[in-house]
Regions:
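Solenoid-like repeat scaffolds
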Residues: 12-17, 49, 66, 98-105, ...
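Residue-level signature for tetratricopeptide repeat
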Residues: 30, 76, 83, 117-118, ...
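Boundary/linker segments of alpha-helical solenoid repeat arrays
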Residues: 51-59, 105-112, 137-146, 167-181
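Alpha-helical repeat scaffolds
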Residues: 5-12, 42-46, 90-98, 124-136, ...
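Long, ordered, amphipathic alpha-helical scaffolds
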Residues: 148-223
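Structural motif corresponding to the intra-repeat A-B loop/turn of tetratricopeptide repeats
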Residues: 34, 87, 122, 153-154
């Protein structure tokens, strides 16, 4: 990969030089397309370790999302955080996402929803409350997070949160489906320019699956 350096720009932020992160990101995607999901996770995590090594420990630095190599590095950090969340290492995933938001304060990659899942898993309710306003109001993700958080916290889901979630029919159908297969058809759909509502709903389910398995009684509250 060559030497990786952090270079300041005229826009009061930084870019990452070296590392060929765009190629690394493409390689991880190609591994996934061939079914080598473990290999893709390892590729992303190794690159994440290289990225962390050049970031200063004592202060946060804003990275330039418009710079291709730097943007790819941020996407790698996000992808690795998702990998670790799905693998059950929630604390590492949380640390990665918090680092990502420090480096990308405008949250171009939309890491906040994934961080919300981490906070629910860790039962960090105050941290969750702080970031809830940053979740998009139009997305089906926010009502799901709010309903799931309430269930995780209290064992119940209030009528208003159920009502908000039921407005998103495709997601509710997916949550209650017998199977949630990430097959070739789904992968083609979700990677297209305009994914179907069904594919988007499945993507949300798959991202939340560890929590839905942990709080298995939640799905029953939707019926």
């Amino acid at each position: 990969m060559g030497k990786i350096t952090l270079k300041p720009t005229e826009n009061q932020n930084y870019i990452l030089l070296g590392g060929e992160f765009a190629k690394t990101l493409d390689f991880a995607h190609s591994q996934e397309s061939k079914g080598d999901f473990e290999g893709a996770c390892n590729t992303r995590y190794k690159a994440f370790q290289q990225i962390v090594e050049v970031l200063p420990e004592e202060e946060a630095v804003e990275l330039d999302f418009s710079h291709q190599n730097t943007r790819a590095a941020l996407e790698i950090v996000y992808g690795s955080a998702v990998d670790n969340f799905l693998a059950g290492d929630v604390e590492l995933s949380t640390a990665q996402l918090e680092l990502l938001l420090e480096c990308d304060s405008e949250d171009h990659i939309e890491a906040t929803p994934q961080l919300a899942l981490c906070y629910i898993a860790l039962e960090e309710w105050e941290c969750l409350e702080e970031i809830l306003p940053d979740l998009g109001d139009k997305s089906a993700f926010k009502p799901l997070v709010e309903a799931l958080a309430e269930y995780a916290h209290t064992g119940e889901v209030s009528a208003d949160k159920l009502s908000a979630l039921h407005r998103h029919r495709h997601l509710c159908d997916e949550l209650q489906a017998a199977e949630h297969v990430a097959d070739e058809s789904y992968l083609r759909d979700i990677s297209s320019e305009r994914p179907t509502q069904q594919a988007l709903a499945r993507e949300i389910y798959l991202r939340c699956e560890p929590l839905l398995m942990k709080y298995e009684g939640f799905i029953g509250k939707l019926r």
